[in-house]
Curated annotation (Swiss-Prot):
Record organism: Schizosaccharomyces pombe (strain 972 / ATCC 24843)
Described function: Catalyzes the terminal and only committed step in triacylglycerol (TAG) synthesis by using diacylglycerol (DAG) and fatty acyl-CoA as substrates. Required for storage lipid synthesis. Major DAG esterifying enzyme in stationary phase when TAG production is particularly active. Involved in lipid particle synthesis from the endoplasmic reticulum, promoting localized TAG production at discrete ER subdomains.
Lumenal domain ranges by topology: 71-113, 163-216
Stretches of the chain found on the membrane's Cytoplasmic side: 1-49, 135-141, 238-345
Gene Ontology terms for molecular function: 2-acylglycerol O-acyltransferase activity; diacylglycerol O-acyltransferase activity
Loss of function: phenotype: Has reduced whole-cell and lipid droplet (LD) TAG levels. Cells lacking both TAG synthase genes (plh1 and dga1) have no LDs and exhibit defects in spore germination and in spore wall integrity.
One protein family per Pfam: DAGAT
Protein name: Diacylglycerol O-acyltransferase 1
Keyword Acyltransferase belongs to the record: yes
């Protein structure tokens, strides 16, 4: 854990990585870790499919398939994380690739439950994965006693093997049932929600930070329902690691993306970055730093039926705190930005 005495307001951070780490074998290990994460869904699904070609595996595959159909652990918020996996070296390599660093502005009471709000979404929220779904950025050292579950779409849990991999990293469904279950288990159990969602990913551009937040009230209602505190988190640099094909609302690409989002619940950003073996073009993210500043919690009383006014007031306070993080640290972490923070509905 590194003390950030030179940055006002930050009391501790993920240790910075050595510059030499990008000039030796670790440079390639970092790239390999990011590549394997990028293709993890395809690899796990393919591995499962290939096994069906071998008759001796059929009894095991059939049993697994039945279990896959009936198991609802990802919806009910069951804790199936494997600490050894979250602490595995590849996730540290993953975080060092960019690098991804967490910055703490206050201590969090491990006797409380928290809803971490992650902004911006970026293309695929790689900072959220590295910083919160693994120990690659030392989350547990910075926030001892806080057990955070990163939340994602239900559709990710319908892929054989991949869904078990996600749950082993403490990644669960973003459904209401899952959220309430996790936040009601025991003190310290918390969730991370990428609040802008699919719509915000379509706005991701290097140098820009466009958030879809003004009409997102679900996470505030969840805070009231469970009595959880809200913690705004701003990931400076999340939008800079991929470029996106022009998709302004007048283009056919945007219209196609909107249709997919309405049908499937997620969208398909057409993005590009660098290659695994080249720095010019590919689907690998660029090596640009992602600095995640974790703000101060907003305590929310437990209420089954809060008034609209109470919801609006907490929502406004959350936005105020988030904008405060942006204004305080934008010149520290994004000195070369091309635009200021923009919030939309």
């Amino acid at each position: 854990m590194s003390e950030e005495t030179s940055i006002p307001g930050i009391i501790a951070s993920t240790p910075p990585i050595s510059k030499d780490s990008r000039r030796n074998v670790s440079h390639w290990l970092q790239a390999l870790a990011v590549f394997l994460h990028s293709v993890s869904l395809t690899l796990t699904a393919s591995w499962y499919t290939v096994l069906w070609a071998f008759l001796p595996f059929w009894p095991f595959l059939i049993v697994y398939l039945i279990w896959l159909i009936y198991d609802d652990g990802f919806v009910t918020g069951k804790d199936r994380q494997k600490r050894w996996l979250r602490n595995a070296p590849p996730y540290r390599w993953f975080c060092h690739y960019f690098p991804i660093r967490l910055h703490k502005t206050t201590e969090l009471d491990s006797e409380k439950n928290y809803i971490f709000g992650y902004h911006p979404h970026g293309i695929i929220s790689l900072g959220a994965f590295g910083g919160f779904a693994s120990e690659g950025a030392d989350f547990s050292k910075l926030f001892p006693g806080i057990n955070v579950s990163v939340l994602t779409l239900n559709s990710n849990f319908y892929v054989p093997v991949y869904r078990d991999y996600l749950m082993a990293l403490n990644i669960n469904s973003v459904s209401k049932k899952s959220c309430v279950s996790i936040l009601s288990r025991k003190p310290g159990d918390s969730v991370l929600i990428v609040i802008g969602g699919a719509q915000e990913s379509l706005l991701s551009r290097p140098g820009q930070n466009n958030l879809v937040l003004k009409k997102r009230f679900g996470f505030v209602k969840l805070a009231f329902l469970t009595g959880s505190s809200l913690v705004p988190c701003f990931a400076f640099g999340e939008s800079d690691i991929f470029e996106q094909v022009d998709n302004n609302p007048r283009t056919r690409i945007y219209k196609f993306q909107e249709i997919v989002k309405k049908i499937a619940g997620f969208t398909v950003p057409f993005f590009y970055g660098r290659g695994l073996l080249n720095k010019t073009f590919g689907l690998m993210p660029w090596r640009k730093p992602i600095n995640i500043v974790v703000g101060e919690p907003i305590d929310v009383p437990k209420k089954s039926h809060p008034t609209n006014q109470e919801i609006y007031e907490v929502h406004e306070e959350y936005i105020r705190r988030l904008e405060g993080l942006w204004n305080k640290y934008k010149d520290v972490f994004l000195p070369n930005r091309i635009s200021e923070l923009k919030l939309s509905a």
